Every structure is written in C-alpha cells, then in structure tokens.
Amino acid sequence: EFKKIQSSEFKVQNVKRKYKLPEKFALYVGDVTWNKNLPRLIEAIQKINIPLVMAGKALMDKNFDKSNPWNQDLVKVEKLVEDDNKIIRLGFISQGDLIALYNVATVLAMPSRYEGFGLPILEAMTCGCPVVTTKEGSLKEVAGDASYFVDAHNADSIAEGIEEVYSNLKLQKELSQKGLKQAKKFTWKKTVQETMRIYRGVL
C-alpha cells in the first residue's frame, strides 16, 4: 500500500542501503517513451548537477532495437547517462521498494509531454513526496495545486523547478502536505472512474 512512512523506519533505511542511494536525490519512475520526456529531464538534471534515481524496467533493457523510431528516447538516454555517476538506473523494482523509494526521495520529477493519467504522481503524493510536473494532458487535473509546474518543452524550466523544490525545505513540506490531501481525492474507485472519463475525453 502506498503511504507515508516514518523516515527512521527499517524499510526506508534499508532501501537506501540496498540501492546505495545518496542522502538526497530527485526520482523518476516510469517508462522511456516519447511522452515521458526523459532525455530532457536528464539534460535538466545535468544542468543543476544533482543525483537522479530512475526506476523502470525499460531503463535496464540492453537488447532493444536501436533502429526502431519508438526507441529513440532510449538511445538518447543511453548516451546521456553513459559517463554520469550521479544518475542511478534501478530498472524494475518491487512495489515495496518503490513505496520506500517515494518516501526517501527529495522530489519526484515527471516532466511529461503528455499523460493519459500520470499514476506515479499520485503514488508519490500518497507517500508524501513533493512533485515537479507539467500541465500537459491530464497532469494539471491530477496534480491540482499540489505540484510545482514546469514547461515540458524547456530544459531550463525543468531544471529551475527541480532545483527550487530540491533546495527549499519549506516548499518541500508545503508540497508534501498539499500532495497528501490531493491524493485523497483519488481513491482507487475514483481513480478508475477518472481514468475512464479522461480516456473517453481523448478518444
């Protein structure tokens, strides 16, 4: 179950040790497809020189077809992270570890160019993790007033937003509290209904 855990709890400390995570880091959770905007997120992170932890099965896929246009973002990500020891790729992780990860992350960064729903935002908010995202697709509606919004098409805007939240403890607490409230609006039943409503709107 996604929830906020006390930072002293074993689960939280254990996930840090298990994956050798830094004390503070930005977190990305998800796939590597055109709409996720991951190459631009990495460029933004490299501008401000802070650690980025990325969780998602596709991130560790070494056997993808590099000539397939759908995989171009994976090709770009491979090149961008090659010599960057501040970027940690975890690949697929269990739900238990993911919950602990949201709890220890300083900020979730999800600068998508489009989302049908944006589940990681709600998962992060439920765990009290501050969120930086965009107003693209359904994200503005899902995030409400509980996120720091950036421009999906501008790496400088993404960098500034992440840095602002990353370095501002007061803002982190404010976004965390607002996020916990916002997430309560989306019980799983509501989430399914809302997802269906949003999908019907785009069909």
Where are these regions (language model features)?
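Carbohydrate transferase catalytic cores enriched for Leloir-type hexosyltransferases
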Residues: 1-203
